[in-house]
From Swiss-Prot:
Additional facts recorded: Partially overlaps YDR134C.
Membrane protein topology class: Single-pass membrane protein
Organism from which the protein derives: Saccharomyces cerevisiae (strain ATCC 204508 / S288c) (Baker's yeast)
The entry's keywords: Membrane, Transmembrane, Transmembrane helix
GO cellular component: membrane
Domain of life: Eukaryota
Transmembrane segments: 64-86
Subcellular location: Membrane
Name of this protein: Putative uncharacterized protein YDR133C
């Protein structure tokens, strides 16, 4: 049994092996470069995207649960770095005694 696709002559389709390829990417692969130049602005925009935006675009495809967990994880990392920096800075003052607990809560400092 064969599947008929509307492809230009000379373009051979290979079956996908557990892989999701966006439709636009398939269209870009199957068309000659001369046809790509006459395409609308979205193709041009895709070519002009800086490579640093690619990971951000992939992040947008994450499930909602990851969007809830990632900010908490980043906040914990920031808190950790802040505590380490604060501990080193406070240790320069001999009159300040640091608590036994290595990490100082930000709330204890400001309140």
């Amino acid at each position: 049994m064969t599947l008929s696709l509307n492809t230009p002559p000379g373009v051979h389709c290979q079956p996908l092996k557990h892989q999701r390829i966006p439709l636009l990417q398939l269209q870009l692969k199957s068309q000659p470069k001369s046809q790509l130049k006459s395409q609308p602005n979205k193709v041009l925009a895709l070519k002009l995207l800086p490579p640093t935006l690619v990971p951000l675009l992939r992040l947008c495809q994450l499930p909602v649960l990851c969007w809830l967990v990632l900010p908490l994880y980043c906040c914990n990392l920031l808190n950790l770095f802040f505590n380490i920096f604060l501990e080193k800075w406070l240790s320069t003052f001999p009159s300040i005694q640091l608590p036994q607990n290595r990490f100082i809560s930000i709330n204890k400092i400001f309140w």
